[in-house]
Amino acid sequence: MSHYHIIGIAGAGMSAIAHLLLDQGHTVSGSDLTANHATAALQARGVQVWRGHDPAYVQGADVVLATAAIRGTHPELEAAAAAGIPRLSRADLWRLWSEQRPVIAIAGTHGKTTTTALTALALRGAGIRCGFLIGADVPALGGSAQWGDPEAPLVIEADEYDRVFLALTPALAIITNVEWDHPDVYPTPSEYTAAFAAFSRQVRDPRRLLVCADDPGALALAGQSEARLYGIDEHIATDPVSCRLAPLDWTASGVTGTATGQQFDLWYYDRRSFGRRLAATVTLAIPGEHNVRNATAALAAAALWGADLRTAVTALAEYRGSSRRFEWRGDVGGITVIDDYAHHPTEVQATLLAARQRYPDRRLIVYLQPHTFSRTRSLWDQWPAAFREAAVVLVGDIYPAREQGDPVALAQSLVDHLIAHGIPARYAGPSALAPSALLAVAQSGDVVLTLGAGDSDQVAAAFLEQCSAMSEER
């Protein structure tokens, strides 16, 4: 067994990897500029986590693990290089695990986290003790990552950022959708699409690639392979490349809302007998049409792996969501607060539609923390349509992540852009002032949604705290 030192261990991806390494019997230490619930969970398992970065932290390590974003001038990387300690990336570990055991990879611009969680839950519900690696905490699975039975598949949320998903050679894969994102890595839509095309070719058996037929970008990839198709309602899809008609292998139909979620019928098309049959009736406790697609993909993957659908469907009914994915944060003063990781216009729109489905008669007050300058600018024309369901949109300063720019000027420009397209928007300022901005507009009966991939979840927490304090004063 080896000692892995992880630089940036507080991040969702790296903290999940740390859990897998611990499950395999390795020793893990790590460092980060911040501490959070992820580092606390690792410390509870005996991991030494340092706040900040220092060359001394790599002493005794056999391997240093760091993301590509951490450059060679980092003090711990320099110390590791001087000591002859090898550096591995996330892609290196994924490649290794993909060689050690079968991998089910969930790729796509949107919906990866939920679909990965649902796939793992479906398999485990059917008695297959799969491992899983997810970029969020999933209470129904007991965390974000577990190694599971090494003979069973490892279900991985296959992130396309920095092309890391190309390190995998999956035994089975899902592509939920393909829509240009991460312009800092993929300057053009064609480069982004090309990466997904390369990923689809790495699936060991093209018949074990599941592609969403409802998404034009994903469906275009299916025309280049023998991929299986899934979607909602339509039983036939038209390939945008060849213009040929293709039957959907898995179809969700008859979607209806329930008091606690939604329900639909799952149909399967047998390519050998050319017959279609009802495979299951599925109940979900999570709202949104996008989650019907996510569940359909997960159940199709489980069925392809040989899982019993009846028990898989039962397991999905217990799923209540993942951290920062339409996560209920609390109710105070008649106001419901939901936090979501949505940071792409399509994700924002899907989240608001899910909120409208669950809360049909309530005003939706949205706080958006735009994530990165490059994404905000590159998807400029898509932002107004994303907020059609919102009563008020509060735009906070840009969360820069790894980029440089003026977070105030671009946020104010986005507000002007939204107003010009008929969206009632206003500038909310830095995240520290956002709770007060929300308090100024939210009223009893409203649903407040905090959206973004930065620290917008802290805005939700602070808003609830301020609301509670005001209620006590009254």
Curated annotation (Swiss-Prot):
Keywords from the UniProt entry: ATP-binding, Cell cycle, Cell division, Cell shape, Cell wall biogenesis/degradation, Cytoplasm, Ligase, Nucleotide-binding, Peptidoglycan synthesis
Keyword Cell division: yes
Name of the protein in its database record: UDP-N-acetylmuramate--L-alanine ligase
Species the sequence originates in: Chloroflexus aurantiacus (strain ATCC 29366 / DSM 635 / J-10-fl)
Entries under HAMAP family matching the protein: MurC
Gene3D superfamilies: Mur ligase, C-terminal domain, Mur-like, catalytic domain, NAD(P)-binding Rossmann-like Domain
Encoding gene (name): murC
Protein's pathway: Cell wall biogenesis; peptidoglycan biosynthesis
MF terms (GO), sorted A to Z: ATP binding; UDP-N-acetylmuramate-L-alanine ligase activity
E.C. number(s) listed in UniProt: 6.3.2.8
Functional description taken from the UniProt entry: Cell wall formation.
Protein family per UniProt: Belongs to the MurCDEF family.
GO-annotated cellular components: cytoplasm
Localization of this protein: Cytoplasm
